Regions:
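Extreme N-terminal, non-catalytic leader segments
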Residues: 1-17
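Small-molecule kinase domains that catalyze NTP-dependent phosphoryl transfer to phosphate-bearing small molecules
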Residues: 6, 23, 94, 99, ...
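Residues at the beta-strand->loop junction immediately N-terminal to the Walker
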Residues: 20
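Walker A/P-loop
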Residues: 28
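Post-Walker A helix-loop "phosphate-sensing" segment adjacent to the P-loop in P-loop NTPases
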Residues: 36-44
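ATP-dependent small-molecule kinase phosphotransfer cores
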Residues: 49-118, 124
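ATP-dependent NMP and nucleoside kinases share a basic, alpha-helical "lid"
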Residues: 103-167
């Protein structure tokens, strides 16, 4: 465990929470529970949000003005066109490995300064884990790391599996560790949310 859980209400502090796991493993659901249970409020941040916005903009630029499409905020559209996001993200990371984590870290200072916890909902790469841990340590921000699995949910592709394995190695060979690890059956959304609320209570966020 990187950060020891607080013992009493006097220790309530805004924290940085990293939710790690495969795509569709329940990370957003767990984050929803954490957000619902946060005493002083929490905001969710996703590495994928800038990628979705830029992908939407690229499609608009190509198909021309006046043509409507759902965009990557729409779940059905995202699922149907996930390959585009995967390849675009892979290309961007190959050019500049930390591009997405740097965008995310730039956006979290304001809510933390307002006393709100920040939950990064989609940590899947070892560099993301390490950069966030280093950022929190440098600023004295409590860091909590949560690893979630759902039975039957595996890596979307070989790159994700390789990088997730590296993430697990990084956590095992550094001081980061895991605050919580959980495994769920499919269809456990309500239970995952309850678990998130319970963790928020334990963390006193």
């Amino acid at each position: 465990v990187d950060t020891e859980l607080p013992k009493n209400a006097d220790q309530i502090r805004p924290a940085l929470i990293l939710v790690c796991g495969f795509a569709r493993a329940g990370k957003d659901t767990l984050a929803d529970g954490l957000q619902a249970g946060a005493i002083n409020g929490a905001v969710k941040v996703s590495f994928a949000e800038p990628l979705k916005r830029k992908a939407d903009q690229a499609i608009r630029d190509i198909i021309g003005p006046g043509v409507k499409f759902p965009g990557f905020q729409d779940e059905a559209f995202k699922v149907a066109n996930r390959a585009l996001l995967v390849e675009l993200g892979k290309t961007c990371r190959a050019i500049r490995q930390d591009c997405f984590v740097e965008l995310a870290l730039d956006s979290i200072c304001a809510p933390l300064s307002q006393g709100k916890t920040v939950i990064i909902t989609d940590v899947r790469y070892s560099n993301e884990l390490q950069r966030c841990a280093d950022w929190a340590a440098l600023r004295g921000v409590p860091l909590y790391t949560l690893l979630i699995y759902t039975d039957g949910i595996e890596a979307a592709n070989e790159e994700e599996q390789t990088n997730f394995d590296l993430l697990l190695v990084r956590s095992a060979t550094s001081s980061i560790g895991w605050t919580d690890r959980s495994r769920w059956k499919p269809g456990s959304a309500d239970a995952i949310k309850r678990h998130g609320r319970g963790l928020a209570s334990l963390m006193l966020i």
